[in-house]
């Protein structure tokens, strides 16, 4: 990948990035909008949670789609670290805060297979180990350089770090009563 110019006009508009974020936002809007009454009758519209979720989507895009991306790729390690910190610590938490616990619990009640899969993937040991392995993998010199050279690998790097971060934050920030956060003491050890 050649060095991208850093200007305020350099915003990524790749279909996979923009389309993926729009698809996630659409699914969320359908879940808390038209399908909310079917899934969780009587549940009011979660306006505050919708703002949190939108903030998570926007912060994700700002991390990977804004001029911060080429600045971090080619010029400033500091910008690269800001980008990764937003992907790992800001966006996933905002998305967690935006997930209505009641809708999650209804999903888990209706689909015990999904609850079982989430229980496994979001277990503190599995999620913490998965995040650590993915983060470490992408920061080995060979893989880091490969991700810088290939836009596809670079997108895979960011997506894998984000997804494992989302899983890692579940034991801390879960909104579900059926898969609740771990107790405060273990949270301190986990972090």
List each language-model region with its residue ranges.
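Alpha-helical membrane segments of multi-pass proteins
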Residues: 1-191
